[in-house]
A protein has these predicted regions:
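N-terminal leader/signal peptides at the extreme start of proteins
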Residues: 13-14
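Sec-dependent signal peptide recognition
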Residues: 2-10
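Cleavable N-terminal signal peptides
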Residues: 7, 17-18
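Sequence context surrounding c-type heme c attachment/ligation sites in exported
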Residues: 21-149
Length: 149
């Protein structure tokens, strides 16, 4: 009886840990998706003319992006050791073998955003801003993001 309780308890703890790990992976993915919303759904679409240029939306997108990027280091502190179920992209285990190098990819993104913030005034300057920020996102993805499907 006592043994059964211990076994069931251990199993429950195991399930809890797996769920917590999936939750961490989801949080990390959600942060990236939120960044994508600002940079791709708003800014990139405007550069392509898919949606009309809107100064307020540009300024908001850059402000949101800045806030999100500042959360990357902390959000990726814990290794979830699993991917989000059905995700297209996953986090490389290299992140947690070399977290300092991973973190070093963040300030260049912040600098690219700071450099263009308040200076974007039209589609042409938005295009330049998009490229300079996106190139810095890519610098991290090349090493630390895995394509799963
Ligand atoms: C310091 C590293 C790093 C930086 C900087 C970074 N990312 Fe990521 N990104 C990752 C990792 C790791 C993943 C894969 C794991 C995940 O999705 O959480 C990822 C995944 C993504 C995904 C795929 C999400 C999905 O599952 O569909 C998008 C979109 C994305 N990032 C956008 C951005 C944008 C936009 C920026 C720049 C503003 C950016 N990222 C900056 C590390 C980074």
């Amino acid at each position: 009886m006592r043994r059964t309780i211990v076994v069931v308890g251990t199993l429950l703890l195991g399930v809890g840990a797996v769920m917590a790990q999936q939750e961490i992976a989801v949080q990390q993915d959600n942060l990236m998706r939120s960044q994508a919303k600002s940079l791709y759904t708003v800014i990139q679409k405007m550069t392509k003319g898919d949606i009309p240029y809107n100064q307020k939306a540009v300024d908001e997108a850059l402000t949101n992006l800045e806030a999100d990027v500042a959360k990357i280091a902390k959000t990726f502190e814990v290794n979830p050791k699993q991917d989000v179920v059905n995700a297209k992209f996953g986090a490389s285990q290299k992140i947690w073998q070399n977290k300092a190098d991973f973190d070093s990819k963040i300030p260049p993104v912040q600098k690219a955003i700071a450099d263009v913030k308040g200076k974007v005034k039209d589609v042409a300057s938005l295009k330049a801003a998009y490229t300079s920020v996106n190139d810095r996102c890519t610098d991290c993805h090349e090493t630390y993001r895995l394509k799963l499907k």
